[in-house]
Amino acid sequence: MLSFCPSCNNMLLITSGDSGVYTLACRSCPYEFPIEGIEIYDRKKLPRKEVDDVLGGGWDNVDQTKTQCPNYDTCGGESAYFFQLQIRSADEPMTTFYKCVNCGHRWKEN
């Protein structure tokens, strides 16, 4: 629900005062409207899991293949862990995900 200031017509924002009472306050003028009898919910962003967490840290249990790391100039890696997933439609080829054994760099091939 959007509310606007009756004095200057700017949007009112929810703020909490020192007493713990929530108010709708205008940033442009001193207008404040106390909020009573309404529950206020706060949205929080949850951290996303890394690919290692999704696999349960099981990169060591997946197959290895000889392939050159895209960061070969810096790490010299010539083997990588890999697994395949069907992430597109069934008539498309599977996507192969790689992780370099030396530096841990991850990449994929369609």
Curated annotation (Swiss-Prot):
Where does each TFIIS-type zinc finger lie? 65-108
Q: Which UniProt keywords apply?
A: DNA-directed RNA polymerase, Metal-binding, Nucleus, Transcription, Zinc, Zinc-finger
Residues that, per the record, bind Zn(2+) 1 = C5, C8, C26, C29
Positions with a binding annotation for Zn(2+) 2: C69, C75, C100, C103
Quick check: keyword DNA damage in the entry? no
Q: A GO BP term, please?
A: transcription initiation at RNA polymerase III promoter
Which Gene Ontology CC terms are recorded? nucleolus; nucleoplasm; nucleus; RNA polymerase III complex
- What's the protein here called? DNA-directed RNA polymerase III subunit RPC10
Q: Which gene encodes it?
A: RPC11
